[in-house]
Amino acid sequence: MEEVPRRQPGGLVEAEGVFQVYEDWECWDYVSQRVPDERLQRWLAMLTNNQLRRQVIREAQIWMWKHKGAAVRRNCGCRLCNPGWGSQVRNVEL
């Protein structure tokens, strides 16, 4: 099952990498609601491989910079709400 970037609680003490986690989560949250369906499906498929997570975030950041005024297309960018490529072979238990 793929793991999307998620927000993790930070503390009062600045830790190395905390800002990167927040940046990744905020980027994914913003972009996954606005990108075209084909691109979202491609990124969700890439997130099944943990080695491609940085590439997905980098592509999402580039897309976000190029499409600053993009309208919201969907409420959520998760696999459950956006079944697509490879979804049929996955069993999701909540």
Swiss-Prot record:
Protein name from the UniProt record: Probable Vpr-like protein
Keywords noted in UniProt: Cell cycle, Host nucleus, Virion
Species whose genome carries this gene: Maedi visna virus (strain 1514 / clone LV1-1KS2)
Physiological role: Seems to function as a Vpr-like protein, since it mediates host cell cycle arrest in G2 phase. Cell cycle arrest creates a favorable environment for maximizing viral expression and production.
GO cellular component: host cell nucleus; virion component
Superkingdom, natural source: Viruses
Main localization category: virion
One Pfam family named in its UniProt record: Lentiviral_Tat
UniProt subcellular location: Virion; Host nucleus
